[in-house]
């Protein structure tokens, strides 16, 4: 905590710390995969359900992983009960919807999966998902956790182009506005 010179009050500072972990595929260990019990129930949040159900951009299919397929123009996402909580589910769905705005029939972003371009697209999706999460009033903790994987690429790009973050924020804002328009137009 530091004292604010103008008010004299103590203020807390948050300092992000990047940690590394060794991760192994469960098949490379003698452990058994943890599975959520069948009794685990994650209750949907009605305002989030209404919002996402009102968007008519691409198909949303149940799958084992969350991703957007630009080739087939659909979102795959596990059932809400596979997530630790509803906020994580909706933040992930928001992230994939932001990706879907990059399709050629929508905003037409370059969605090449070469590492630098893909890292930029991920930054757009992370920022856009934060915008949607804030709009819906849900916690964006998972978004922050996912962003650490791309942090090194983003910092390198920011060093090379100081406007990198602002450009990504502009693209994320366009994607967010596009989704809001789709949501409003289908109600």
Predicted regions span which residues?
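N-terminal accessory/interface modules of nucleic-acid-binding and processing proteins
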Residues: 1-187
């Amino acid at each position: 905590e530091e004292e604010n010179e103008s008010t004299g009050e103590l203020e807390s500072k948050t300092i992000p710390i990047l940690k590394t972990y060794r991760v192994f595929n469960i098949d490379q260990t003698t452990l058994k995969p943890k599975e959520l019990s069948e009794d685990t129930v994650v209750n949907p949040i009605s305002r989030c359900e209404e919002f996402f159900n009102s968007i008519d951009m691409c198909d949303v299919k149940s799958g084992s992983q969350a991703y957007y397929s630009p080739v087939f123009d659909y979102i795959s996402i596990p059932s809400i009960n596979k997530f630790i909580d509803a906020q994580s589910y909706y933040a992930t769905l928001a992230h994939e919807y932001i990706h879907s705005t990059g399709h050629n029939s929508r905003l037409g972003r370059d969605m090449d999966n070469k590492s630098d371009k893909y890292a930029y697209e991920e930054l757009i999706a992370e920022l856009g998902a934060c915008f949607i999460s804030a709009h819906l009033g849900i916690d964006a903790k998972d978004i922050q956790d996912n962003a650490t994987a791309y942090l090194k690429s983003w910092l390198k790009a920011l060093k090379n182009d100081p406007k990198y973050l602002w450009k990504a924020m502009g693209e994320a804002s366009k994607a967010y506005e596009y989704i809001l328009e789709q949501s409003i137009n289908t109600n």
